[in-house]
Design a protein with these regions (language model features):
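Long, low-complexity, Ser/Thr- and acidic/proline-rich intrinsically disordered regions
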Residues: 1-11, 18, 23, 295, ...
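Cullin-RING E3 adaptor/co-adaptor recruitment helices
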Residues: 2-140
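Leucine-rich repeat domain C-terminal region
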Residues: 5-50, 524-534, 547-582
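Short, solvent-exposed loop/turn at the beta-strand->alpha-helix junction
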Residues: 95-101, 121-126, 146-153, 171-176, ...
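Alpha-solenoid helical-repeat scaffolds
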Residues: 95-209, 213-219, 228-232, 239
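Conserved hydrophobic beta-strand positions in leucine-rich repeat
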Residues: 113-118, 139-143, 163-168, 187-193, ...
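Leucine-rich repeat
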Residues: 134-135, 158-160, 181-187, 206-210, ...
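Ankyrin-repeat and related helical/solenoid repeat scaffolds used for protein-protein interactions
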Residues: 452, 459, 476, 483, ...
């Protein structure tokens, strides 16, 4: 029973993604975000670690743990149990949302190593007494999104063996509560993501955490002036300060001696080219994120000396062509994000030698067919983002040799149906975005040989019921968006057998009726469904009863009422988290 004790503890702090709001009839990007952020259901948890194939069944240990959890009210203490067993029972109660303040008491003095209560409801200071009772056995604690305050934090003072602590979104913890951290010198991972209590003054406590390897301060907007307290944390390998909006060049100079840094996240900070110049000595840096910072191509001179760099994000910066020759020195780059900059075809000349690139984002840049020819030698490319560029059908011929390409975004480009023949030759493609009014049934028909597609975005394409026949060829589709307004119930018949679908967006097809809901009633893997702006009514909701995995349902601007949607969730689809109308 050494599984819990022996698990690896050197994992990176999860940096997550920024929350985004979506317009009413938005593309399914909002649904994709939702899929990543949804909590697991009880059914998800019950399958964890259990075989799902024929003849497989839970292990004896799993059965014992499940039975103890079921009868948890019968027990007063687990101190006599082996630590691994107590740990498994605790984890199971948390995963199934069955842990209460009362049942938590049974784990007092059980020498648990991991207390993961992140986003768990009801966690407060009173719970921390049991957490702290694990004393020096305690190695990791997660109380993110809790009501724990300074008092609760102070109770952890004697748990000196803690290596990992996550207090994300803990608004009740002030700079006073941070003071107790100074004694936790064994901490290697610390996360206070979007916590208002983290201030420049409060960061004094970090100065003693000399063993820190991972530090996440994302969204802590009051830390300007506090980075001086990090200057001696020379073991730091990852530092996340995304959306710390007031971090300036004067702060970055205190990072110059952190030469072991491998991952530095600085998006949306007040950093200029001067601030980037302080990073010159970080020879081990592999990931650098400067998205949304007021830097120019002049910063590339300093960045070009970061020989270990494999990922560089300059999205939404002020990059022009001048200075882009410095990209040529970044030979190890695998990921380069230049979206929403002012670069033109002239910049792409300097990318052609970056032969290790696997992902390239040129979204909304001023590039066209002439520049695309410089990408033809990047044969390791797996993802290419060309949305909102002037790339047309002629430019696609230069991509024919990119046999490893798995994802391409051609939304809002000048590409037409003729170009689809060239795309169809890229047999490794899994994801294709053709949100483009110039794409019609003819172009879709040219793609039917791409039977391995898992994601197909035809949001604004002019696909009719005739073209919808092509959907039968894409048996592996997990995500489909077809919202051009020309699909009727007849076209949906070609979707009803795509059993792998988890996301389906049919919004803005105004002629869809309740028959559509009947046709897709067998797509039981669906997690997100959007049939907004259609003729669907309350009467059609009965067809959704078997879609038990559904978490998001959007039926805005239909004949469905909010009251009926609420009834649907209460009586039929209890796992629904997001629904419209509401």
């Amino acid at each position: 029973m050494g599984g819990v004790c022996s698990r690896k503890r050197s994992q990176l702090v999860d940096e997550g993604d920024s929350f985004q709001t979506s317009p009413r009839f938005s593309k399914t990007s909002s649904l994709k975000w939702l899929l990543l952020s949804l909590p697991r259901t009880n059914s998800d948890v019950s399958r964890k670690g259990q075989g799902e194939g024929p003849g497989q069944c839970p292990s004896l240990m799993e059965l014992c743990v499940a039975r103890v959890c079921k009868d948890i009210d019968k027990y007063s203490s687990f101190t006599i149990l082996p630590r691994d067993l107590s740990q498994q029972i605790f984890n199971k109660l948390v995963e199934s949302n069955c842990l209460t303040e009362a049942s938590l008491q049974t784990f007092r003095d059980c020498a648990l190593q991991d207390i993961c209560l992140g986003e768990y409801p009801g966690v407060k200071d009173a719970w921390m007494e049991v957490v702290a009772s694990q004393r020096k056995s305690l190695l990791s604690v997660d109380i993110s999104c809790s009501e724990v305050s300074d008092s609760g934090m102070d109770i952890l003072r004697d748990c000196s063996s803690i290596q990992s602590l996550a207090c994300n979104y803990c608004d009740q913890i002030s700079e006073n509560g941070l003071g107790m951290l100074s004694g936790l010198s064994n901490l290697t991972s610390l996360s206070f993501k979007r916590s208002n209590g983290v201030t420049a003054e409060g960061m004094r406590a970090f100065a003693n955490l000399i063993n820190l390897v991972h530090l996440n301060l994302e969204g802590c907007v009051k830390i300007h002036g506090g980075l001086i307290h990090l200057k001696d944390l020379t073991k730091l390998e990852s530092l996340n300060m995304r959306y710390c909006n007031y971090i300036a060049d004067s702060d970055i100079k205190y990072l110059t001696d952190l030469t072991n840094l491998k991952d530095l996240q600085l998006s949306c900070c007040r950093i200029t080219d001067l601030g980037v110049s302080y990073l010159r000595g970080m020879s081990k840096l592999t990931h650098l994120n400067l998205e949304g910072c007021a830097v120019t191509a002049a910063c590339l001179e300093a960045i070009s000396g970061l020989a270990s760099l494999i990922s560089l994000n300059l999205n939404r910066c002020g990059i022009y062509d001048d200075g882009c020759e410095n990209f040529e020195g970044l030979k190890k780059l695998k990921t380069l994000n230049l979206g929403f900059n002012y670069i033109t075809d002239a910049c792409l000349v300097h990318l052609k030698e970056l032969i290790n690139l696997e992902s390239l984002n040129l979204d909304s840049c001023k590039i066209g067919d002439e520049g695309i020819q410089h990408l033809k030698g990047l044969v390791l490319l797996q993802s290419l983002e060309l949305s909102d560029t002037e790339v047309g059908t002629n430019g696609l011929q230069h991509l024919s040799g990119l046999r490893n390409l798995q994802s391409i975004n051609l939304s809002f480009t000048l590409v037409t149906d003729i170009g689809m023949k060239k795309i169809s030759m890229l047999n490794s493609l899994k994801s294709v975005n053709l949100d483009n009014r110039q794409i019609t049934d003819v172009g879709l028909a040219a793609l039917t040989s791409l039977t391995g597609l898992t994601h197909l975005d035809l949001f604004g394409a002019r696909i009719t019921d005739y073209g919808a026949n092509c959907f039968r060829c894409f048996k592996n589709l997990k995500s489909l968006e077809v919202c051009g307004g020309f699909i009727t119930d007849a076209g949906v018949k070609n979707i009803k057998d795509l059993k792998a679908l988890t996301q389906l967006n049919l919004s803005q097809n105004v002629n869809l009726t309740d028959k559509t809901l009947e046709l897709i009633s067998g797509l039981t893997a669906l997690v997100c469904l959007n049939v907004s702006n259609s003729r669907v009514s309350n009467a059609g909701l009965k067809h959704l009863k078997d879609l038990q995995n559904l978490r998001s349902l959007s039926l805005d601007s239909t004949r469905v009422t909010a009251n009926e949607m609420k009834k649907l969730r209460v009586t039929t689809l209890p796992n629904l988290i997001s629904m419209r109308p509401e």
